[in-house]
Amino acid sequence: MGNCLHPAELSPSTQNSSQLNSDLWNFSYDGNDSFPDVDYDANLEAAAPCHSCNLLDDSALPFFILVSVLGILASGTVLFMFFRPLFHWQLCPGWPVLAQLAVGSALFSIVVPILAPGLGNTRSSALCSLGYCVWYGSAFAQALLLGCHASLGPKLGAGQVPGLTLGLSVGLWGVAALLTLPITLASGASGGLCTPAYSMELKALQATHAVACLAVFVLLPLGLFGAKGLKKALGMGPGPWMNILWAWFIFWWPHGVVLGLDFLVRSKLLLLSTCLAQQALDLLLNLAEALAILHCVATPLLLALFCHQATRTLLPSLPLPEGWSSHLDTLGSES
């Protein structure tokens, strides 16, 4: 296969066929008629398929494994801190929702090796579909949880609005599961690699998945920023609660944008005139995917930083929950 940089060479059979056609042409038209010269080499170069180098190929396996291990360790540490008895992170506003963010990050970290290239050709389509389901399901759930945490803020405290956290959790994870159905049905194993399937029969599923990613990863954070700015401009209150956790969308926003562009190109709704443009889009797809994968390491760090800042501010002014005062008195008497 050739590409825009290295054209495909003719095989011997193709060369013989071309020579035969040329001989027949010269034999049939041996008169004084003149015909325009045609640059067959230039036409061949233009017709050669455009080929892009995949950054996330077998050589990227160490990257997948390292990110998976670090993500599992970091998410597990954060979950331990959240559920550790009498630990001050439980005073963090909306900590049950934040703990679910760590769960989503851990789930993503676990399935990263399943979708990683270079682990052999033994993976089945069912395993790949499950991997994509958890991959995108955890990401969708984290984005929706962040949106609710930003919108409701301190109201998500477990003791302030009974049942709100549980109801939101079930609803948001359910919505995330529904949003993963298109990519789950439109993915499988090809040549031993887990990959989304692109075909006319699956075009509706591909379009639905692209729209879901665009809505959750791109439009949701833009909507939060817009609501924040609009409420502030109109003096209608503080608006969505802006904090360091919003940096999570930096890891998935490019993925949503580039995935939408790729779907438009595959559907021929957006035409790329040059091979270089197609190669640039493929490169952006790889970079956006790598950035999205890194979120499973960054999310626990963002959670730790947020809870550290929140508890440092709130701890002196908040009344201690039942059981904390006796625990602190015991520590004071021992000292």
From Swiss-Prot:
Keyword Acetylation applies: no
Gene3D superfamilies xrefs: Rhodopsin 7-helix transmembrane proteins
Disulfide bonds: 50-275, 128-194
GO CC terms of this entry: early endosome; membrane; recycling endosome
Compartments (UniProt record): Early endosome; Recycling endosome; Membrane
Cytoplasmic side: 84-94, 153-165, 228-243, 308-335
Topology class, membrane: Multi-pass membrane protein
GO MF annotation, one: C-C chemokine binding
Regions that span the bilayer: 63-83, 95-115, 129-152, 166-186, 207-227, 244-264, 287-307
Cross-referenced CDD domains: 7tmA_ACKR1_DARC
Membership in a protein family: Belongs to the G-protein coupled receptor 1 family. Atypical chemokine receptor subfamily.
Assembly with partners or alone: (Microbial infection) Interacts (via N-terminal extracellular domain) with Plasmodium knowlesi Duffy receptor alpha form (DBPalpha) (via region II).
Name this protein carries in UniProt: Atypical chemokine receptor 1
Organism encoding this protein: Macaca mulatta (Rhesus macaque)
Organism lineage string: Eukaryota, Metazoa, Chordata, Craniata, Vertebrata
